Amino acid sequence: MKLNELYNNIGAKKNKKRIARGIGSGKGKTGGRGIKGQKSRSGVAIKGFEGGQTPMIKRLPKRGFNCISTKKYNIINIYNIEEALADGRLSADDTITKEKLVEAGVVNNKNNKKLVKLLSICSDDFTSPLSLKLDAYSAKAKDLIEKAGGKLL
């Protein structure tokens, strides 16, 4: 047996029905779409319509809401700032602001829409005296920065 001699078994592959190709084809004239109406026209799909049964979107309960006044924070840790200082992306002499963190690549903040909050996870031995001007700080982060001789503006 050779590759060019391979073929399907009889009846294994059925040719698809070509619609709207004349009355003799069995699917001619209206092409299985019925007569007139929205669904007989081209390019129409009624989104969410399930043929008269209650659609899925109505069967499921409404849940939750989006609070308008919720503040969305970009969260960074003290060790992220330490890494940027060690790499030379940030300077310890300058006041560290949200804009400088974005420039250094510590925070991904498009159009400065989100606020920046500083946490102190895994950072118990912070010693750099920094001056920071961010939107929010955790209580532990405040203590660590003030113990190291830093300022929160």
Curated annotation (Swiss-Prot):
This is Large ribosomal subunit protein uL15. Residues 21-41 are annotated as: Disordered. Part of the 50S ribosomal subunit. It holds the Pfam family Ribosomal_L27A. PANTHER family: 50S RIBOSOMAL PROTEIN L15, LARGE RIBOSOMAL SUBUNIT PROTEIN UL15M. InterPro entries: Ribosomal_uL15, Ribosomal_uL15/eL18, Ribosomal_uL15/eL18_sf, Ribosomal_uL15_bac-type. The gene is rplO. Residues 23-35 have a biased composition (Gly residues). One of its GO terms (molecular function) is rRNA binding. GO terms for cellular component: large ribosomal subunit. Binds to the 23S rRNA. Keywords: Ribonucleoprotein, Ribosomal protein, RNA-binding, rRNA-binding. The keyword Signal does not apply. It comes from the Bacteria. GO terms for biological process: translation. Gene3D superfamilies: 3.100.10.10. Belongs to the universal ribosomal protein uL15 family.
